[in-house]
Amino acid sequence: MSKGINPPKGGGTMEGRYMSQAHELLTNTGVENMANRTAERMIPLMNSLVTGYSIALAKTLGSGAGAMTQILLSEIGEVLSAMVDEILGSGQASYELENVEELLKNAFLELGIAKDVKIEKNIKDNMVIYKLYIKGSLFAPVHKILIDRGLKEFPLSPEGLLAASIVRRVLRERKDGNTKARINVNTKLPVNGETLIVEIKEVGSL
């Protein structure tokens, strides 16, 4: 596991530790008075924070943003997918290669992150490539601002990171899987429409 995340104290499997971290994030908000913590107020605030970080990283890293994506996946990829498991419970599918499309759709539709998701699966140079066509994203206001700022791609998109964390976990946990599998993810902003496109492919091992 990456040194960036300190697992909870105690024993247990690595998967159990990630699930414990996910449970901690979901149950402990750090806010005692929840009366005013409504989605109508929190979602715009979160979108503004995501926008700010995205613009700052784009200006700072430029084409190097892809490397930051790898770091983020290494640090929080397993925790993200574990949070999806924690929320969906028995409604989530098992992490097998043939279930990737179902896993991805569950994450976006059942959690209310998007209104519609279509997935294409292709094989090129012996690598499986997944393309997600996402409409009605919760983060659509972020996309609009980034487009207004002249951006066409968004490697560090929340949608891309979530989808990549699930695909990465499948590659690592499937039968005869590669525990060091590494993937590449990029997101194309809906410049001429309303569809966000996320592309994910395996690029090698750590």
Curated annotation (Swiss-Prot):
UniProt name for this protein: Uncharacterized protein MJ0312
Organism expressing this protein natively: Methanocaldococcus jannaschii (strain ATCC 43067 / DSM 2661 / JAL-1 / JCM 10045 / NBRC 100440) (Methanococcus jannaschii)
Upper lineage: Archaea, Methanobacteriati, Methanobacteriota, Methanomada group, Methanococci
